[in-house]
């Protein structure tokens, strides 16, 4: 089971999701998308919360209002963190999550520590948590199938882009050749005209 929330504080709305337990977190880690941003309470146990960003955006493009929604949701889903003030939330792109065979279920590391960001959360804001909870949906998605569908769509888009680029290049080559042919034809016509003038007769005295 995966819990989905909608952050509608900006337009278009953003999807936030998290697993029910550490076992589902394993699948979320495995089948995350490049557009996903992972959130967790720093140094405390908490839910693994993911924010799905629009394609073509990065972690630096997260709207401030959406970021606040995410960290409040993470804090609220930490047994210890929800009762504490002044905690830190870490977040990083899904692609930066590292999972090795010797790690426990639900445990992760990072490929590059410099890509991990930290935001301080002073206290729980009930209005935000309640608003998000009203959008909560329980689903049983086929994460592997969704990931494959997403990747297939991306491959098709890249294939179409490559084909379009090749088409443009072919048209440019054709246009360049046509310009060269026109240039050569013009030069030839000019040369023929000059030859005709040089061979002409100016006198009417002829036999």
From Swiss-Prot:
Membrane topology, record value: Single-pass membrane protein
GO molecular function terms listed in the Swiss-Prot or TrEMBL record: DNA binding
Keywords: Cell membrane, Coiled coil, DNA-binding, Membrane, Phosphoprotein, Transmembrane, Transmembrane helix
Designated name of the protein: Coiled-coil domain-containing protein 25
UniProt record, GO biological process: positive regulation of cell motility
Record localization: Cell membrane; Endomembrane system
Family: Belongs to the CCDC25 family.
Parts forming coiled coils: 112-189
Domain of life: Eukaryota
Biased composition (Basic and acidic residues): 140-183
Residue spans of biased composition, Polar residues class: 184-198
Organism: Danio rerio
Topology feature Extracellular, residues: 1-104
PANTHER family associated with the record: COILED-COIL DOMAIN-CONTAINING PROTEIN 25, DUF814-RELATED
Lineage: Eukaryota, Metazoa, Chordata, Craniata, Vertebrata
Function: Transmembrane receptor that senses neutrophil extracellular traps (NETs) and triggers the ILK-PARVB pathway to enhance cell motility. NETs are mainly composed of DNA fibers and are released by neutrophils to bind pathogens during inflammation. Specifically binds NETs on its extracellular region, in particular the 8-OHdG-enriched DNA present in NETs, and recruits ILK, initiating the ILK-PARVB cascade to induce cytoskeleton rearrangement and directional migration of cells.
GO CC, alphabetical: endomembrane system; plasma membrane
Region annotated Disordered, chain positions: 140-207
Region feature DNA-binding, mapped onto this chain: 20-24
UniProt subunit comment: Interacts (via cytoplasmic region) with ILK.
